[in-house]
Amino acid sequence: MGLQPEEARPRLAALGFCAEDVETLAAHFLDAEARGRSGHGLARIEWLESFEALDPDARPERLVAEPEYERWDGAGALGYLTLAAVVDAQLAAPPPRARLVVCSRTFPTGALGYWIRPLARAGLVALLTATSPRRLPPPGGGAPLTGTNPLAIAIPSSDGDPVVADVSMGAVTHGDVLAGRAQAEELVPFGGPQAHKAFALAVGLQLFVDALDPEDGFGAVLLVARPEADPVPGLRELAAGARLPGDR
């Protein structure tokens, strides 16, 4: 039997995280479980317990703060906590129109849609991608060239119910392997005969982040903007009750 929900906070506290960080991390893991995404859920706490270089006292740093651009450094903090700090900063001071945020040394990042959902609920459009260890080979086989490199997009709605699309480029995620829901050999681009499309997007996202991030290691890039229109209610009407991305 895996980790139980009531064990999440005590186990995180035992790793040395402060109460605020325990709550941030636990909320993310429990939300992932509630959405059926156990690869980003409680299994990750056991994974963190195996980290030899875990520094629960590390704090992300904002190195550049301009109206349309920010750069952050994880500075040894978990990527989850870096993204939480970045999102809090955008909510506290939204961009005049649009802002690009580049995050260096930001890993692991978890379920990206979770981090940008609050931005959409606050009336902002958001797009977030992040790199990860190279685990996806090209279709047809070969050495792994890219991470699963997820992409999440959140669109606000005047009805208060944003659409949040969150897709990994892998047929499964590394988290699914950690949670025992998939085998390592299943880490290939999704799409079967059309896997070249997911692989192309994984490569594009990898290079996009790498080109903007001046540091070695894994990074994330967030675009946050004020919307000029309100397309979600119309789409929901057309959907006639069908589930849209991010719905529970």
Per-region residue spans from a language model:
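Flexible, glycine/charged-enriched surface loops at secondary-structure junctions
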Residues: 19-24, 38-42, 214-222, 243-248
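Active-site cofactor/substrate anionic-group-binding motifs, chiefly glycine-
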Residues: 41-91
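Small-residue-enriched flexible segments
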Residues: 165, 171-213
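Phosphate/diphosphate-binding glycine-rich loops and adjacent basic-rich segments that engage nucleotide
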Residues: 134-186
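A generic, well-ordered mixed alpha/beta core segment in the N-terminal half of proteins
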Residues: 69-142, 152-155
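Acidic, glycine/proline-rich low-complexity segments that act as flexible tails and inter-domain linkers
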Residues: 6, 10-21, 25, 38-57
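Catalytic-core signal marking the mid-to-C-terminal active-site face
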Residues: 2-7, 217-248
